[in-house]
């Protein structure tokens, strides 16, 4: 897909993707990536949607992508901003910021099925884009690995929530931990499951 656009004079082509949209703790992480036109022999043969890769493979590809990319950027939007502006706004504005942070301006942007109004160049939302375009796959890996590292750091700061395991998603064990210990500054309190679990902790605290 990227080669067709570049052949039409619309390059360089950047892929953009996010990680953590569906989580209820931690940031949403968004990456933009421009890959070289020729990927032969650079070690990205297994590159696809980050969710279909093992953690070990993602970590290896993360380093390769950063080494070979023409340009890439990774940004994190906090839970506080998500609560303030909403996840959709955080996602779309974050994608604009990630593209703007590239040190090579793309001629065209491909996203994983997300419309991004306000970009200064044309863009195309691609259904299952992280499987269809290598630049989106690369952005997917960059976003996922960088966010996972953030959650592992938060797990060290706030042990007892299992953040390194579930990466901030709303598992039963995670919500039970919030109801027992209360939320952290990195939880998304605008999300009903977090608000309910935190309220349960507050009620128990008051009774105690």
From Swiss-Prot:
Record keywords, A-Z: Cytoplasm, Endonuclease, Hydrolase, Manganese, Metal-binding, Nuclease
PROSITE patterns recorded: RNASE_H_2 (PS51975)
Alphabetized Pfam families for the sequence: RNase_HII (PF01351)
The reaction(s) this protein catalyses: Endonucleolytic cleavage to 5'-phosphomonoester
UniProt-recorded Gene Ontology molecular function terms: manganese ion binding; RNA binding; RNA-DNA hybrid ribonuclease activity
InterPro entries attached to this UniProt entry: RNase_HII (IPR022898), RNase_HII/HIII (IPR001352), RNase_HII/HIII_dom (IPR024567), RNaseH-like_sf (IPR012337), RNaseH_sf (IPR036397)
Alphabetical GO biological process terms: DNA replication, removal of RNA primer; mismatch repair
A Gene Ontology term for the protein's cellular component: ribonuclease H2 complex
Enzyme nomenclature, EC number: 3.1.26.4
Location(s), subcellular: Cytoplasm
Enzyme class, spelled out: hydrolase
Xref: HAMAP family: RNase_HII_B
Alphabetical list of PANTHER family matching this protein: RIBONUCLEASE H2 SUBUNIT A (PTHR10954), RIBONUCLEASE HII (PTHR10954:SF18)
Family indicated by similarity: Belongs to the RNase HII family.
Name of this chain's protein: Ribonuclease HII
């Amino acid at each position: 897909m990227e080669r067709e656009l570049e052949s039409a004079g619309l390059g360089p082509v950047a892929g953009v993707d996010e990680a953590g949209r569906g989580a209820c703790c931690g940031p949403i992480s968004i990456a933009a990536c421009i890959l070289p036109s020729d990927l032969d022999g650079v070690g990205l043969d297994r590159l696809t949607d980050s969710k279909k890769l093992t953690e070990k493979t993602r970590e290896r590809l993360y380093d390769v992508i950063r080494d070979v990319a023409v340009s890439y950027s990774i940004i994190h939007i906090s839970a506080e901003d998500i609560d303030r502006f909403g996840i959709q706004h955080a996602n779309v504005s974050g994608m604009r910021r990630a593209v703007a942070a590239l040190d090579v301006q793309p001629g065209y942007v491909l996203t994983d099925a997300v419309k991004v109004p306000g970009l200064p160049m044309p863009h195309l939302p691609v259904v299952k884009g992280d499987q269809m375009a290598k630049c989106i796959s690369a952005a997917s890996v960059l976003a996922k690995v960088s966010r996972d590292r953030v959650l592992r750091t938060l797990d060290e700061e706030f042990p007892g929530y299992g953040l390194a395991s579930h990466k901030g998603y709303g598992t039963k064990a995670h919500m039970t931990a919030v109801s027992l210990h209360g939320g952290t500054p990195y939880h998304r309190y605008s999300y009903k499951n977090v608000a309910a679990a935190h309220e349960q902790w507050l009620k128990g605290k008051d009774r105690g």
